[in-house]
A protein has these predicted regions:
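N-terminal accessory segment detector
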Residues: 1-110, 114, 133-293, 297, ...
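Extended, Lys/Arg-enriched charged tracts that mediate electrostatic binding to polyanionic substrates
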Residues: 110-128, 313
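Short secondary-structure junctions
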Residues: 126-131, 275-281, 316-323
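C-terminal structured interaction module
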Residues: 296, 300-347
Length: 347
């Protein structure tokens, strides 16, 4: 089963910068399905109004752009349509999204209800060459029923996603790649990573989501941790990064991942497993202090720095059994992170 999965994902590549590249050249991250559910539940709860539709449209627009610009999914006028449709359906399983059944207008074993609905809308429109209004009903955990109503208006292809200001934009000319470090076990609906069902998500889906919620009001009275200090970003971006960091930290805290750290190499091994090997970027440890007052200085180069930041903070706190103070400076090269014990003020 593992050999079959390795073949299925043989064209997915890992770079020395802690990113994963899918066959089309797009960057993706490897997410546990339950992890994503936990993250999304936390992240959405911060907002004053529901943002579920924002995630659907982020997934739909991103997949629409992918299908519309990758020549492998170009639908011929006469012969060869079936081959393209099979390739489209195979993409679902390869990415771990579930089984798309457009003829039956349903999704089997969806990775996530909102993501699945968004991806399905893009595939249905691409396959039929028309625009549709979509409604969906989750019959149970295994099936989503889709209802499509044709729209007459012409809408241009969704544009390429724009990276947020806090994501490093400098291109590295010398990229070396290797095969995926993770062992993935294939299933009929996707794959498992260890004991957990997992999926690949394009990072551009997150970029589209970020811009759709940037500046939206949070819940009244919501306050972020006083122990996270961020510099180098404007107010709206800082608030969004705080929300991303807090939600990814809570996502990690819900896991049972064990962290034991005595040396810098111990810490770097955990970073490789939880950050770099899953596409969240590269972390360079610049200073590591063990003992009774542990601290660490790092530089983070990540396509999703807000999520990676929360993971690093919660991992460090679990490793040392105590909360920490986090100081983060965003610049044009990376995010500089300093984690150290909280100062206790005695009155």
């Amino acid at each position: 089963m593992i050999d079959e999965a390795s073949s299925r994902h043989s064209e997915f590549l890992q770079t020395q910068f802690g990113t994963i590249i899918e066959p089309s050249g797009a960057k993706v991250i490897l997410f546990g399905v339950n992890e994503f559910n936990e993250w999304w539940s936390c992240f959405e709860s911060y907002y004053e109004a529901p943002i579920g539709r924002k995630l659907i449209y982020a997934a739909s627009d991103d997949e629409e752009h992918h299908l519309g610009t990758d020549t492998g999914y170009e639908i011929p006028k006469w012969f060869g349509k079936k081959t393209v449709f099979q390739r489209m359906n195979a993409r679902w399983i390869t990415m771990g999204w579930g089984v798309n059944a457009p003829l039956d207008a349903r999704i089997q074993s969806p990775c996530h209800d909102l993501l699945g609905a968004g991806f399905a809308l893009a595939h249905y429109e691409h396959q039929n060459g028309k625009r549709y209004q979509m409604e969906w009903r989750q019959l149970n955990s295994e099936f989503i029923k889709l209802d499509f109503t044709e729209k007459l208006d012409e809408i241009p292809l969704a544009p390429k996603a724009v990276m947020p200001a806090w994501v490093l934009k400098r291109e590295h000319p010398d990229v070396t790649t290797t095969n995926l470090e993770q062992e993935l076990e294939l299933r009929s609906f996707g794959f498992f990573m260890g004991r957990e069902r997992a999926m690949f998500l394009p990072i551009s889906v997150f970029y589209r989501l970020y811009y759709s919620v940037l500046g939206r009001p949070f819940q009244a009275g919501l306050k972020w941790s006083n122990n996270l200090h961020i510099e180098g970003l404007d107010h709206s971006s800082t608030s969004l990064v705080e929300a991303l960091s807090e939600s990814s930290a809570l996502m990690f805290k819900s896991s049972d991942y064990t962290i034991f750290v005595q040396t810098q190499s111990d810490w770097e091994a955990h970073i490789k497993t939880r950050i770099s090997a899953r596409g969240f970027g590269a972390v360079i440890v610049e200073e590591f202090v063990a003992g009774s007052s542990p601290s660490v200085r790092m530089s983070l180069n990540s396509p999703l720095p807000g999520l990676a930041l929360g993971l690093l903070i919660s991992m460090w706190e679990r490793a040392h059994g105590a909360p920490c103070t986090s100081e983060v400076i965003f610049n044009t090269e990376s995010a500089l992170i300093y984690l150290h014990p909280r100062k206790v003020e005695y009155i």
